[in-house]
Amino acid sequence: MSVDPACPQSLPCFEASDCKESSPMPVICGPEENYPSLQMSSAEMPHTETVSPLPSSMDLLIQDSPDSSTSPKGKQPTSAEKSVAKKEDKVPVKKQKTRTVFSSTQLCVLNDRFQRQKYLSLQQMQELSNILNLSYKQVKTWFQNQRMKSKRWQKNNWPKNSNGVTQKASAPTYPSLYSSYHQGCLVNPTGNLPMWSNQTWNNSTWSNQTQNIQSWSNHSWNTQTWCTQSWNNQAWNSPFYNCGEESLQSCMQFQPNSPASDLEAALEAAGEGLNVIQQTTRYFSTPQTMDLFLNYSMNMQPEDV
């Protein structure tokens, strides 16, 4: 079916007739002889639009957008799912650390060196690693782990032992000497410092004690106290030997003007008394006297008793 060339001019007229309420513009139509062709073309246009309408931009947007009834917000991933997906992506990236297995000989050497020296220099670590056929990093890591273990052990066990020591070391009988000791017995969690504090064992306390010792020695251990009259020779002389001398001195004092015969008689009396005393002491000091007393006691009869 042929369409006249006036059809393009008649199309705006048809559109204008449909929306004449919105636009009251005057409509200009072609001649009357072209009117039937215009009606045919206008009748065919809706048919072609219904059969194959051209897709517009709005139609494309509607087709791409999801239907709210079928999938309401279900296709959009949440933040939790995103984080889980990221973690799953990162898990295979992590590398598991290979744990070094030391032999018994290596452990013995390392422990011995750690007991003597806890911190090694770079050169010492390199020498030790060469001796043990280990890498520098392995030796360094082992020493770091061992230091942490020792500190943890001291932190867990040191307070218990220190409390027991302080309780057992109490000495109430000597408060003047041990009062500073209890104050200086402190707990050391790190284990690097000595147990005794500098305040308790400083030079001032020791100097005071030495001064006290000197004063004690000067007052009590001097020679004057020991060299008394009780330790002289007169105290050790027996009264038996002094009897004659005393009698002689008494005779000399009370008879200054006596004649010579009286003096000789006094000397003889003093000498005889001295000899008698010496003989009696010698007689009683011999073992024969002891035997006599024993025999006499054994031979005594009940009648005599």
UniProtKB/Swiss-Prot annotation:
Stretches for region Sufficient for strong transactivation activity: 241-305
Result, substituting F102A: No effect on POU5F1 promoter DNA-binding
The keyword DNA-binding is annotated on this UniProt entry: yes
Tissue expression pattern: Expressed in testicular carcinoma and derived germ cell tumors (at protein level). Expressed in fetal gonads, ovary and testis. Also expressed in ovary teratocarcinoma cell line and testicular embryonic carcinoma. Not expressed in many somatic organs and oocytes.
Gene Ontology molecular functions: DNA binding; DNA-binding transcription factor activity; DNA-binding transcription factor activity, RNA polymerase II-specific; DNA-binding transcription repressor activity, RNA polymerase II-specific; RNA polymerase II cis-regulatory region sequence-specific DNA binding; RNA polymerase II transcription regulatory region sequence-specific DNA binding; sequence-specific double-stranded DNA binding; transcription cis-regulatory region binding
Effect noted on mutating K137A: Inhibits POU5F1 promoter DNA-binding
Superkingdom of origin organism: Eukaryota
Keyword line: Activator, Developmental protein, DNA-binding, Homeobox, Nucleus, Repeat, Repressor, Transcription, Transcription regulation
Predominant cellular place of this UniProt entry's protein: nucleus
Gene name tied to this protein: NANOG
Residue ranges with Basic and acidic residues bias: 83-92
Protein name stated in the entry: Homeobox protein NANOG
Subunit structure: Interacts with SMAD1. Interacts with SALL4. Interacts with ZNF281/ZFP281. Interacts with PCGF1. Interacts with ESRRB; reciprocally modulates their transcriptional activities. Interacts with NSD2.
Polar residues bias: start-end ranges: 65-81
Family from the record: Belongs to the Nanog homeobox family.
Location(s), subcellular: Nucleus
InterPro entries, alphabetized: Distal-less_Homeobox_TF, HD, Homeobox_CS, Homeodomain-like_sf
Record's miscellaneous remark: Exists an other tandem duplicated non-processed pseudogene (NANOGP1) and 10 other NANOG-related nucleotide sequences located on different chromosomes, all of which are processed pseudogenes lacking introns (NANOGP2 to NANOGP11); except NANOGP8 which is a retrogene.
Keyword Transcription on entry: yes
Protein's job: Transcription regulator involved in inner cell mass and embryonic stem (ES) cells proliferation and self-renewal. Imposes pluripotency on ES cells and prevents their differentiation towards extraembryonic endoderm and trophectoderm lineages. Blocks bone morphogenetic protein-induced mesoderm differentiation of ES cells by physically interacting with SMAD1 and interfering with the recruitment of coactivators to the active SMAD transcriptional complexes. Acts as a transcriptional activator or repressor.
Stretch list, region Disordered: 1-96
The entry's DNA-binding region: 95-154
Result after altering Q144A: No effect on POU5F1 promoter DNA-binding. Decreased protein stability
Sequence repeat start and end residues: 196-200, 201-205, 206-210, 216-220, 221-225, 226-230, 231-235, 236-240
Alphabetical list of SUPFAM superfamilies matching this protein: Homeodomain-like
Pfam families: Homeodomain
Reported effect, Q124A: Decreased POU5F1 promoter DNA-binding and protein stability
Gene source species: Homo sapiens (Human)
